[in-house]
Amino acid sequence: MELKKDINAVSIDMLLIVHSEKRRAAQGTLSDQQANPSSLLQRGGGFQGVGNGVRRWQKLEGNDFHENLVEKQHPQQPQVITSYNSQGTQLTVEVHPRDAMPQLLKKFSLAKRLQGDKNGNTRPRQPGGKDAHAYPWDRSSLKSMSLDLQQFEKLDIYASQVTAKSGLDELVSDLLQEAHTDLERVRAIWIWICHHIEYDIAAAQEKDRQAFKPTDILRTQKTNCDGYAGLFERMCRLAGVQCMTVPGYSKGFGYQTGQSFSGEFDHAWNAVYLEGRWHLVDSTWGSGLVDTITSKFTFLYNEFYFLTHPALFIEDHFPDNKNWQLLKPPQSLRQFENNMYHKSEFYNKGMLSAHPETSMIRTVNGKATVTIESCAPTLFMFMLNGKQEHGLLSLRKNGMKLEVYPPTMGTHKLQIFAKGNSDIYSSVLEYTLKCNYVDMGVQLPAELHQPVGPSWFSEQMGIMKPSHPDPIIHTSDGRCSISFSVEEGINVLASLHGDDGPITEETQRRYIFQLHREKQTELKVQLPHAGKFALKIFVKKRQEPGNYIFVFNYLVCCANTKVNWPMFPESFGNWGQDNELLEPLSGVLPANRNVPFKLKLHGIAKVLVKGQDTWPLTLNHEGYWEGSCSTAGCQEVYVMVLENANHNFYSYILKYKVNAQ
């Protein structure tokens, strides 16, 4: 219908209400309480059964090691469609359940209308082309607009400390005391909600869903995702900032890789209008997390969900209206279901991309490879079916590489965790791994921990310039020698681990002999048999108390079944870090032989080798103590030293066994 301009014409907002029996049947009849005009939204909080009675849950982003969770909510947002003719006449159509109060009628009854923009418009405009951001993400920023978070420090502190003394109007007024732009107003509201409103776990567990009113939220300081979104919208409107609540699907707890979404929406968030464009926020996921073990909410602020770049927001938020994706091109529901889900901590910890880019991956010849690119050095770990086994994870300067070898055919769960400056690893990625072939030739030692091979982290811990930069060492004769520079004041400890049954901690170190030459450390390794071994490297600051810290390990492989090397000699506490043994290196000496000895010791007055008899060693011009001793008639041979020439007390430093005749 065309309306001609006339001086006597009257502008009329026409409301057409269309009842859908299918929509009503799918969503159910709302209660009288939910239809209350004072309700923020025509939907309840908490969780409800879905289909076969399985409950949906919503994860409050925060990503602790236990995958902390809360329940998903089910928005039932009415559809509002607005069209304009060439003369500017507006027709608004709303589709909603039969027994629900129309949203537009409720808006007409509000005592306070949304403050208009400069053009006098009272209703927020729908998103258009100028709001859209390019997809995929261009890596330019985690935010949809340029922000300097340091400029918010004073405002954030102020907003987080404001208390709700009475009503919502006064609260918003107090928050705006230090906010002078629309961006600062939105920031103050966001910070206050994220630091004061906790997720209402008890309400979420009730069978009857309830609508959360702003007055109730302020009184209890609790709500669900509907309440978070509704409160954020209401406070923004009171502050004169255009804001909308957006319902849709989300990838929270309970989400299974590759799952399909249908039926009722399970989450709600907000779009806010700033500097001529729409932007996205989720105060529910910005506020904290719920621990699955204790079922307690913990405030854990997550900056990621404030003005998130739409190309990142779409990874776990799919709106009911594709225009609210704010993307060009928009993603389909099928794409949303199939796309890789990078959790917020993936980006919070500086990661940029992961390969493969699909959440479902298959092994090739029994192996799957995952790589991650990051903008800064980051520590990683992984779990395959809940265990840190069957994989080789090597750190790179800007990321990591993981090779996984599933031990059985079938479907496996692969989780990847990352750690920034904190001491807590956070879940950042999850893959579903399908394996149709097992490489029986790959049997990794159970004691092979992560990471494998030297990296920026080992340099940071004082180990530099390794002779073997690769994580895997192959030896044909069962022996190898590894050397590296060691930072001043750092002690190094190494141990060898196989899968041939339990062995003592002492035995684990007896197949490694450690030599020190100035700032250079050499590890001589002899394998007891063929197989795969984990060579673990530990460090400790010499002047500090405490235990040695694990840094990395090598995977040492030998296929020669004839290998059967004995242990190295046993060393005692007086064997110094800078001592050097040239011979004999075998810890087991032949019987009835004269065995040559040669070693370098520092600060020693005399050296003796004691078998059945005692033989002195002499100091040559190169600084080595050398000589020989007979193994006849003895089972053990000791090397003893006298540190002070004025004393007669000798200390044992090395012990050898003699083969039985």
Swiss-Prot record:
The keyword Ion transport does not apply. GO terms for biological process: muscle organ development; neuromuscular junction development; proteolysis. Coiled coil: none annotated. The keyword tRNA processing does not apply. The active site is at C225, H267, D282. InterPro entries: CAP/Cytokinesis_protein, Ig-like_KY, Papain-like_cys_pep_sf, Transglutaminase-like. Residues 28-41 have a biased composition (Polar residues). One of its GO terms (cellular component) is Z disc. Interacts with IGFN1 and FLNC. This is Kyphoscoliosis peptidase. The lineage of its organism: Eukaryota, Metazoa, Chordata, Craniata, Vertebrata.
